[in-house]
């Protein structure tokens, strides 16, 4: 029994000391089936470039890991549209065979490899014939799945918290530590809905930010083109108001949030698209609960009466959220620090004048309880007060 106990203890210690797998992409050898002139672009860590292959059987790359090592997994990041892809290894007869594949639902995906894999292919999933537009390919060596390997869950069937925002990076600039606290620390289903899809590289930066903040549910984007204005009226000249209302009402019904957050009615620094978000939410809270409004989404999802809605910088029923409390899920970092890390994932925005700030005129810790079906906040330090 003593020997068995010692063996068990050693086994547990070995696993307790397991380290996250390292990115070994730069050390691997690659043999692309097509598109060799652009293949380097899927390893340059630049989200504005991509590797384009031919269609069909030549849509693959063979990967050989460094001698004496093995690969544990692969992450792909796609340009503009998700792609159904998979990993292949050779069987006993030397034939390439499927070792796992995706359905092509997400712009960033991770697949594990069979233990001890030293040579494999990244190729189309069975039945997929399209060419690759692959922005980044990342190969991971031996070890546990690394924290940056994005393994998205479907968009929430029932959201605890929903953010309706205009652009990529708004989720941390104006909402601070909300996602790190509620998604990362408390494990709540947090659904982010965005009006402007923006450029493909910004969507990948956005996913990096959400993943850094602990969000697991895949976001959704509408298709409104980006256009700057300083007024609500000018914004609605570019975007059809009824289409915006229809979209936001459908999101509310589809995701059924307990708590909904959105932009300042004045658009923070005045951005018309931010104003649209606030205006649409204020209108659609009632519409989403009315079966006679936008009958298509009412039939598909039913109606939904949102229990609580907070608007950034709303002057009534003010809550001042403390984003400076340490979070165990992030090793003691505060939600503010994690939000800052998330914003740094928006690499293309680092030379702008925007910063994550829980102070000043656009303080991202200040919100007003615009609507409640569960009574007023008393403690005023938790969006889920009276709901938990």
Residue map of PLM features:
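Proline-aspartate-enriched helix->loop->beta-strand connector
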Residues: 244, 248-269, 277
């Amino acid at each position: 029994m003593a020997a068995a106990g010692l063996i068990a203890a050693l086994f547990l210690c070995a696993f307790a000391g397991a380290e996250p797998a390292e990115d070994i992409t730069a050390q691997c050898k690659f043999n692309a089936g097509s598109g060799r002139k652009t293949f380097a672009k899927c390893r340059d860590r630049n989200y504005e470039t991509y590797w384009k292959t031919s269609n069909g059987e030549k849509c693959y790359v063979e990967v050989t890991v460094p001698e004496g090592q093995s690969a544990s997994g692969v992450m792909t990041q796609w340009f503009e549209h998700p792609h159904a892809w998979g990993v292949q290894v050779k069987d006993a007869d030397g034939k390439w065979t499927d070792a796992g594949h995706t359905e092509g639902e997400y712009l960033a995906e991770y697949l594990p490899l069979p233990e001890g894999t030293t040579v494999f292919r990244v190729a189309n999933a069975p039945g997929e014939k399209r060419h690759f537009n692959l922005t980044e390919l990342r190969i991971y060596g031996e070890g546990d799945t690394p924290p940056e390997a994005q393994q998205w869950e479907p968009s929430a069937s029932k959201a605890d918290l929903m953010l309706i925002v205009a652009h990529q990076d708004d989720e941390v600039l104006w909402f601070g530590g909300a996602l790190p606290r509620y998604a990362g620390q408390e494990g709540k289903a947090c659904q982010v809905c965005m009006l402007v899809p923006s450029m493909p590289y910004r969507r990948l930066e956005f996913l990096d930010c959400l993943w850094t903040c602990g969000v697991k549910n895949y976001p959704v984007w509408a298709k409104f083109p980006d256009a700057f204005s300083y007024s609500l009226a000018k914004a609605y000249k570019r975007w059809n108001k009824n289409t915006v209302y229809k979209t936001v009402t459908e999101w509310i019904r589809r995701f059924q949030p307990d708590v909904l957050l959105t932009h300042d009615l004045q658009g923070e620094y005045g951005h018309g698209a931010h104003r649209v978000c606030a205006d649409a939410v204020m209108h659609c809270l009632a519409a989403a609960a009315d079966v006679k409004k936008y009958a298509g989404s009412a039939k598909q999802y039913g109606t939904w009466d949102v229990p609580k809605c907070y608007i950034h910088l709303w002057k009534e029923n003010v809550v001042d959220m403390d984003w400076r409390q340490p979070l165990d899920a992030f090793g003691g970092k505060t939600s503010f620090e994690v939000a800052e890390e998330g914003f740094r994932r928006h690499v293309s925005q680092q030379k702008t004048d925007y910063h994550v700030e829980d102070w000043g005129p656009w303080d991202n810790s200040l919100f007003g309880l615009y609507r409640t079906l569960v009574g007023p906040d008393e403690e005023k330090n938790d969006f889920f007060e009276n709901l938990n």
